[in-house]
């Protein structure tokens, strides 16, 4: 009798164990699929101008000449900045290493975001052209603004404090006899504090740094009467 009960209990135990094992596998698989399906947060510089009206600003003197039309070339960037990752550095540990946030992405490459923001600002006061746009016959060759994005990251001085750091090399050139003549060049380096030690704080700081850099570039171009 005991042997018979044992023979009946053994298959039942094995069946129960297999059922529990399958439930465990299904649960773990579901958790893994849920974790892998979490999409990273997508960031840009915000909606930009919300009105077509010019912002209130000091009027230009009547005798001031019109600003030259300007070609804004595609911004060149180092290979590390060609992707969409939101990058940071730990200056207190290894400042030479760029690291990406796992769950944060730019909506497009940083160089494209910077160019878009630059055109939005400069276009308020002058005619902007794209590379390859034609100009009227007899007109002087338009000036070209070239930019190289060398740094665009959140730099942590400590685990709790950081800044958005942007570094741009800006060059103004003009076509001359099938070549380009450099008219002016400068380096623009801007940093703005991050309000929080995370990707969202870094994005806001880099947006502020970009806007400040663009203001600096615009003011510089006007001092050159370009």
Language-model regions: role of each:
Residues 2-20:
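Bacterial N-terminal signal peptides that target proteins for export
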Residues 27-30:
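C-terminal motif of bacterial Sec signal peptides marking the signal peptidase cleavage site
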Residues 32-112, 224-226:
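A structural "domain/chain start" motif
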Residues 34-52, 125-178:
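Surface-exposed short loop/turn segments
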Residues 69-74, 87-89, 144-148, 165-171, ...:
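Soluble periplasmic/extracytoplasmic beta-strand elements of cell-envelope proteins
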Residues 97-104, 176-219:
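Short secondary-structure boundary motifs at beta->alpha junctions and helix caps
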Residues 108, 112-136:
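Extracellular-facing segments of soluble proteins and assemblies that are Gly/Ser/Thr-biased and enriched
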Residues 119, 123-127, 154, 218-226:
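Sec-exported extracytoplasmic/periplasmic mature domains
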């Amino acid at each position: 009798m005991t042997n018979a009960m044992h023979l009946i209990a053994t298959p039942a135990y094995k069946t129960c164990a297999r059922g529990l094992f399958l439930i465990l596998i299904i649960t773990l698989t579901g958790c893994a699929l849920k974790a892998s399906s979490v999409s990273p947060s997508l960031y840009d510089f915000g909606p930009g101008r919300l009105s077509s009206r010019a912002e209130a600003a000091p009027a230009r003197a009547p005798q001031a000449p019109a600003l030259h039309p300007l070609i804004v070339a595609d911004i060149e960037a180092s290979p590390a900045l060609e992707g969409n990752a939101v990058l940071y550095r730990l200056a207190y540990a290894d400042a030479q290493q760029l690291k990406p946030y796992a769950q944060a992405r730019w909506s497009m490459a940083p160089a494209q975001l910077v160019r878009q923001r630059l055109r939005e600002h400069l276009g308020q006061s002058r005619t902007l052209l794209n590379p390859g746009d034609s100009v009227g016959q007899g007109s002087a060759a338009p000036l070209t603004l070239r930019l190289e994005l060398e740094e665009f990251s959140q730099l942590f001085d400590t685990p709790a404090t950081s800044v958005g750091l942007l570094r741009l090399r800006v060059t103004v050139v003009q076509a001359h006899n099938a070549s380009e003549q450099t008219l002016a060049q400068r380096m623009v380096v801007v940093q703005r504090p991050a309000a929080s030690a995370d990707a969202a704080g870094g994005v806001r700081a880099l947006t502020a740094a970009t806007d400040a850099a663009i203001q600096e570039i615009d003011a510089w171009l006007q001092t050159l009467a370009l």
